[in-house]
Amino acid sequence: FVGSRGLGDVYKRQHLDIMDGHFVPNLSFGPQTVSDLRKSSSLFFDVHLMLQQPDRYIDPFIEAGADLISIHLEPEYDHSRALAKISAAGIQNGIVINPDTPAHSLLPYLEQVDLILFMTVNPGFGGQKFIYEVLSKAKEIDEIRKKENLNFLIEVDGGVNPEHVKSCLNAGVDILVAGTAYYKLDKLGRKHFADLFENAYLKDFL
């Protein structure tokens, strides 16, 4: 389930978490699965690389059909070069920070990125509690975005449920990703979740 504010039909998104069992303890899937999904889907593929060496896997996910690739700031590699490589392929790039990573670490990349993703849980497993303190970082970056007239989007991922929608909007968040909370709901509960997004001017859900 992905809600995005004011982005129109083009931004019906599928958020895909790629985990390597090293940077995060869990293991998911690779570019072949993304390629297989692409054959039967026209959704916007928002590919989140939770990898120790994400720069080594950019090309395979570009070839698999990603529309956006986001990479974590925490591992050591040339972040700016990796972001430029993604952009050079004609797709969108993003940079991600974990809950404990300070917002100011994003400053060198604000003019280079299409998206900033704030993890609102420690990445790797679903079902964790939303960390509200992260929203102060999102707000800080949103204020810089407005002051400098920058165009990147702000996304949050992790522990998102209906009670967080208003707080996220107030922090300047454009895109919310909800997994465990949404899929645990019955049909009526999912409709209620979607209605909350609609009433808060968030549109286009998956």
Spans of features found by a protein language model:
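Glycine-rich, proline-tolerant flexible connector loops at the mouths of alpha/beta enzymes
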Residues: H15-P31, V121-G127
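Structural motif
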Residues: D9, S40, A64, A89, ...
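Alpha-helix-loop-beta-strand connector modules within alpha/beta enzyme cores
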Residues: L27-V47, K85-G94, V134-N151, L196-L206
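Catalytic cores of alpha/beta
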Residues: D55-E63, T101-Q112, V160-L176
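Conserved anion-binding
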Residues: R56-Y57, D67-L153
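Glycine-rich phosphate-binding active-site loops on the catalytic face of alpha/beta enzymes
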Residues: I71-Y77, T120-Q128, A171-H192
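Single conserved hydrophobic/aromatic residue that forms the stacking wall/gate
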Residues: F1-Y11
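Conserved, mostly hydrophobic/aromatic
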Residues: D17, F61, I116, I141, ...
